[in-house]
A protein has these predicted regions:
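Transmembrane beta-strand segments that form the barrel wall of outer-membrane beta-barrel proteins
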Residues: 127, 155-159, 300-311, 321-322, ...
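Structured extracytoplasmic
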Residues: 1-124, 128-136, 194, 198-310
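Short aromatic loop motif centered on NTY/YTY
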Residues: 158-159, 164-209
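Mid-length scaffold segments of soluble, non-membrane domains
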Residues: 133-145
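Residues that define the transmembrane beta-barrel architecture of outer-membrane proteins
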Residues: 170, 315-319
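Outer-membrane beta-barrel channels and translocator barrels
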Residues: 146, 179-181, 328-330
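Short, hydrophobic/aromatic-rich segments at coil-to-beta transitions
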Residues: 118-126, 150-155, 183-188, 331-335
Length: 337
């Protein structure tokens, strides 16, 4: 009985929040946090990211080991530079409304109003692509009216009538601030997205907030950082930071419903049906059945499940049993069959 099944989850209404994107009710099921130091050198050009702390909470923690879910979200939430001529999003290149080569021919601009944005008087400049089916944004530019004509804020929306694979709607908001030496720098970046895991199923909502602070234009011993191999470095203690660390170092507090995620997960795990759903989803996504409840302990997994049962006209129904060892048995040698 559907009503009897849903009654087991009636406590969920206490954890509902409202989407900042479209105002619809949402349930926070995953929170990921990352605290990093970003280094940039203009000449020779180099970029390095040192991850000081990172953690992941939510139902997807058991479903994802940095694979499909993580890689897809990272592709969506790549930081952009509004001042570049082209902005890459999901393997597509969008013309920037500030492009020095195409902006004035690619977009139509409309002065909407003058208003205060974070203490700066700005002109509200709307823009739309000249061709509604092209890879351009709709949105707003807020330009300061103090004589410098700096970009204070920008809103970018992807048009509804273009194909972005499994993404339905995407919005990017950036705000800039002026430093004491008059330099303008990126202050905050918000990305909102509605997307599907499977087309035709319930949409998912994701929101990423990036906060930029503690700018330093005279970094000591920067050569030692740029001498590191690779662009990304995760400190050994990054994933082991306690709650107290996040409380003191998180630049913006979690929202009430985000902070209540641990309580929500505790309630959900008391419902046997939820655990069965998660276990089934884990098997479907990974293709393997672990021989232990904890992924950090299991030494052998059965699978892949998509080849366990098969049938054809010549051989009829067939069943095979297979599996493979994990890094918990030996991190260097693996066996499968």
């Amino acid at each position: 009985d559907k009503n009897k099944f849903l009654k087991k989850f009636k406590f969920i209404k206490n954890y509902l929040d409202t989407s900042e994107f479209n105002g619809k009710p949402i349930l926070t099921v995953s929170v990921r946090e990352n605290l990093s130091d970003f280094y940039y050198r203009k000449s020779p050009k180099a970029e390095k990211t040192i991850v000081r702390a990172k953690r992941m909470q939510g139902i997807d923690k058991t479903l994802d080991d940095g694979g499909g879910i993580t890689s897809n979200l990272e592709e969506i939430f790549k930081s952009i530079n509004i001042f570049d001529n082209n902005i890459p999003i999901l393997l597509n290149r969008f013309v920037s409304p500030l492009s020095s080569t195409l902006a004035t021919t690619y977009y139509h601009y409309y002065i909407m109003d003058t208003l205060d944005v974070g203490g700066d008087k700005c002109v509200d400049l709307a823009f739309v692509p000249a061709n509604s089916e092209s890879y351009g944004f709709t949105g707003r530019l807020y330009i300061t009216l103090d004589g410098n004509y700096a970009v204070k804020k920008v809103l970018l929306n992807t048009p509804a009538n273009i194909n972005l694979n499994w993404v339905d709607k995407l919005r990017i908001e950036q705000e800039f601030k002026q430093m004491s030496d008059s330099t303008w720098v990126l202050d905050q970046e918000n990305t909102f997205v509605n997307f599907y895991v499977v087309k035709g199923t319930q949409q998912l909502y994701a929101h990423q907030l990036r906060n930029y602070d503690n700018y330093n234009f005279n970094v000591q011993n920067a050569d030692s950082v740029f001498g590191l191999l690779g662009a990304l470095h995760v400190l050994p203690e990054a994933t082991a930071q306690p709650d107290t660390f996040w409380t003191h170092n998180r630049p913006i507090p979690l929202k009430e419903k985000e902070d209540a995620l641990k309580d929500l997960l505790g309630q959900l795990r008391k419902v046997p049906a939820f655990n069965a759903i998660i276990k089934t989803a884990e098997i479907l996504i990974t293709g393997y059945i672990p021989t232990a409840n904890d992924k950090k302990v299991t030494k052998f997994d059965f699978g892949p499940m998509n080849t366990t049962f098969s049938a054809n006209h010549l051989e009829g129904f067939r069943m095979r049993v297979g599996g493979m060892t994990t890094a918990n048995l030996n991190p260097y040698w693996f066996a499968s069959g």
